[in-house]
Amino acid sequence: MQREFLLNLFKDCDFYELTAENFEELVIEKLPKDFSYKYHFGISKVCIIPMGADYVIKIPFAGQEILDDLEPYEFYYEDFYSANDVIGFSWDYCLTELLYYNKAKKRHINKCFCKTRLLGFVNYHPIYIQERAITFRQKNGDLDYKSEKSIRMEKYCEEHHFRCFDSEWLADVFEYYGAKTFNKLMSFIDEYNIIDLHTDNIGYIGIRPVLLDFSDFAG
């Protein structure tokens, strides 16, 4: 993985007022034709997955298109403003992930998160790189049953006043890391109010359970 090579992939991209509505035109269509990849996106960022790589590239959106209440079928652009407290980057939800990862590192629970770092800037826009993981949904589908360990985990979370957002995955976390790290992770999630942890935002690197999208969203 070469930093300059990866950054150069985006040299022709336009990041001005980048949103979930326009990123395909401004970014995806500008990528080199011989670059093989897949991509997924949400409201705050796009995740580009180079074929065969053990990492993903994340690009934050700057804002979103808002439906105008006064003009039917008309939209206007609005910057994100609540991603973090960093002056000049309060719109950047990928930076939020990097900040959380660094906080987790100080508490020795960073292995519970996909390693995240800033790759660099292209046309004044930040580009991030993150360990590649498989999502819980990709690995397990939509489970329609509860295992015994899942039921035990629900009880454990209730007894310790933890929010039990996916008991099957949490049971894997407990088994892999042990009670001490599990409790520290759950306290971290509660402290920073990381709520949006559905089955596409949690997953695994090999057998290691990880959070792979942990910026949450607040507008």
Sequence positions of predicted segments:
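Short, solvent-exposed loop/turn segments at secondary-structure junctions
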Residues: 62-65, 121-124, 133-137, 203, ...
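Juxta-kinase regulatory segment immediately upstream of eukaryotic protein kinase catalytic domains
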Residues: 1-37
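Catalytic activation segment of kinase domains across protein kinase-like and atypical kinase folds
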Residues: 192-219
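ATP-binding glycine-rich loop module of kinase domains
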Residues: 36-38, 43-106
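Active-site Asp-x-Gly
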Residues: 67-76, 154-161, 215-219
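Protein kinase catalytic-loop region centered on the HRD/HxD motif
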Residues: 184-193
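Conserved structural core of kinase catalytic domains
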Residues: 88-90, 98-178
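Generic beta-strand structural signal
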Residues: 50-51, 121, 197, 204
